[in-house]
């Protein structure tokens, strides 16, 4: 998104969120102006400045994940993605090392889940739905556990991108 690329719905959401945050800070900007900052690379440049100011390494931003396992998860049937329950997938990611159950748990910064589909997207059997990244060994049972939380229906699912803006 910060490189001016990515899904249009996510870009639009990010621009709307940025507009609200700017307004809260007393700065008025149109959605078009905000989008221009993304496409021109200004937002990415500012993010890089913030990473450097906090002692971060810019190379880490652009280095691909170096994990033992990159497991693709495919749609098991044709239809429409009806649900990708955040709680279940969040707990799953935590067990991969991408989160903590307790404060003292270690984090594996390379672990996580990248979703290729979102709720409402059409899929055909065999389409990539997500990729699991982890340094743990993953068995078929674990993949099946993940897949049971990818709900696919044979009818179009109506989705609201933003449920409500609370001011």
What is each PLM-predicted segment?
Residues 1-167:
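Well-ordered secondary-structure scaffolds
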């Amino acid at each position: 998104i910060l490189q001016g690329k990515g899904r249009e719905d996510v870009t639009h959401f990010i621009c709307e969120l940025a507009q609200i945050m700017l307004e809260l800070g007393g700065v008025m900007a149109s959605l078009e102006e905000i989008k221009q900052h993304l496409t021109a690379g200004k937002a990415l440049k500012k993010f890089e400045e913030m990473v450097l100011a906090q002692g971060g390494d810019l190379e880490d931003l652009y280095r691909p994940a170096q994990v033992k396992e990159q497991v693709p998860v495919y749609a098991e049937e044709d239809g429409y993605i009806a649900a990708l329950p955040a709680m279940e997938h969040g707990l799953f990611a935590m067990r991969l090392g991408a989160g903590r159950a307790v404060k003292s748990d270690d984090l594996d910064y390379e672990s996580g889940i990248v979703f290729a589909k979102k709720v409402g997207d059409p899929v055909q059997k065999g389409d990539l739905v997500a990729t699991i990244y982890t340094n743990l060994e993953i068995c078929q049972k674990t993949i099946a556990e993940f897949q049971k939380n990818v709900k696919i229906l044979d009818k179009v699912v109506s989705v609201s991108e933003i449920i409500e803006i609370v001011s």
